[in-house]
């Protein structure tokens, strides 16, 4: 959502969101004057809040009440106002470290089953965040590499062809930007080089699982073949992602009872639909939280924040869902997240989800 706010509007929206998160009460100008050093009068704050309301970022639940953030207001807060200048960086850094240390010290990978470890991680995440925590089981693939070939199809353009053990064939194109030395190679020279690389890779990689290949360090290629390393790594990772199969859509869920006591969940029918989603319709929720953001860079997990009506599942369209993937090498194999009301401490929740995803990525790599 592209909304251009002045510095004053940003600070007043930030203060309104922070105050409402803390109190769950509609916010008036007097409360902001008393609690925040905004450097302006109550009348000025009222005028700015009126402008923010007209912009759809705040609204009044009742005519005589103060204002509360809309989904759009929370979106601006998350996208533009959680910055080093406005957020409480020290507090969120402490929370992230608390999650990391708790996960390191309380989980016993050698003695516990994988499910027990992830249940324990979910409990820690729920306790620290104050939200419902969600962690999926890691996914895998049984596909095996049968054959791999690199071939030139045009000048400075090559194709990778991969055949798996089920005889499925996959291909991907790469544009080369040759160095001055490489540009001297004629078509026969490039074909010869590609055959050497293909033979080397087939000799060393045939019979290995795609999951294993996706975690390889392709920088180990001989120096003269380094220009193919990033292409091979990205292509194999993408292919492996396509072959990932949900061995289970089970989600570890913790913290439900505490969160559903929040004032936002006072309607019994709403609570029942959320519980039904968490307990009986996990396959729908799994597909949502394991959806990898299109903008996510290879090998880097991004925290995704879905606020209110941005959630496609009806039971949680009044909630905020914050998720990130955890990885085995470059490959996303599972997700970790928290679910709570839109009146959520976004700074803290984003920090702890990122910390948990990083910990699990390190543990699985």
Swiss-Prot record:
Gene Ontology biological process: negative regulation of DNA-templated transcription
Keywords of this entry: Repressor, Stress response, Transcription, Transcription regulation
GO-annotated molecular function: DNA binding
Region forming the signal peptide: none
Superkingdom field: Bacteria
The keyword Secreted belongs to this UniProt entry's keyword annotation: no
InterPro entries: GAF-like_dom_sf, HrcA, HrcA_C, WH-like_DNA-bd_sf, WH_DNA-bd_sf, WHTH_transcript_rep_HrcA_IDD
A Pfam entry, by short name: HrcA
Protein family membership: Belongs to the HrcA family.
Described function: Negative regulator of class I heat shock genes (grpE-dnaK-dnaJ and groELS operons). Prevents heat-shock induction of these operons.
Name the record gives this protein: Heat-inducible transcription repressor HrcA
Organism in which the protein naturally occurs: Nodularia spumigena
Gene name per UniProt: hrcA
